Amino acid sequence: MQNFLPYPDFAASARVLDQARLGKQRVETLQTLRALVIPDYGWVRHPAIRMWMGYVPALTAYGLAVVSEWVSRGHADSTYRQILEFAPEVLDDPHVPLPPWFGEPGLHLSHRSNLIQKAPEVYRERFPGTPEDLPYSWPEPAEECVAAEPAGRRLWVWRSPDPFEEAADILLPPTSPGGSAGPKWGRQLRAFEETVQDGDAVAVLAADRDHLRTGHLGPVLMHEDGLLRPVRPHGVLSRSEVHPPALLQDPRTFFGVDLPPVLVR
């Protein structure tokens, strides 16, 4: 988990990266954004994550600059849309607030130094006169901003194991789709059984990425394969109605987001 900022300029930082690191930066930026925005995602104690707390639009702008440079070199990309979902507003106003550490000479120097440590044959020539033994500079955030579960009315989201099936029921087995019965899966089961209220809104993530099938959840029932709740179909929800849409990148099978205004009744 590391974003490289050898210069106090997103585009210039992307341009100076070699092919391997530039490609990986797209994925690492996406992972960092998810750790900042998606509850229970993990990694929130990592200093490279913490330094961006409170500045998701700025990190989104950095990620888009990296993608732009990657594509300009002739490569295919699948991350642009996912990164943009964290702060769609940056397209209309790219001059987003920047972290207070952005522009501090010592921080950018430390990133140049660590790039040399990773690939001296590439970066020694690009950053002449740079010390080659500096540790990373990871400033602490002015305020800790850890993604939390919604506090008010929720839209429950279910990631269907069969995206092409029109499910009338939601079934959560004792173990996760990966076969684990760990703490994270246990929290999903408890939410499904105890937190959900009869009649709560639900949306199903299925084959159509841009639209979610919506409905209302019925009472929890015991099933031979786990816990089950019937769904009363209601309609269709545009992905863009969830704010931010990136919350739907949550890898969990069952989770909640703030109830979109269009569903408030």
Give short role names for the model-derived ranges.
Residues 30, 50, 116, 152-154, ...:
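Residue-level recognition of well-ordered secondary-structure positions
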Residues 58, 171-243:
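Structured alpha/beta reader/binder surfaces that contact nucleic acids or chromatin modification marks
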Residues 149-166, 224-265:
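Contiguous surface segments at macromolecular interaction interfaces
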Residues 1-150:
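Expand to "…catalyze enediolate/carbanion chemistry for C-C bond making/breaking, isomerization
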Residues 71, 79-80, 179-181, 258-259:
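Short, surface-exposed, polar/charged, turn-prone segments marking secondary-structure boundaries
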Residues 146-194, 265:
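Compositionally biased, charged N-terminal/linker segments
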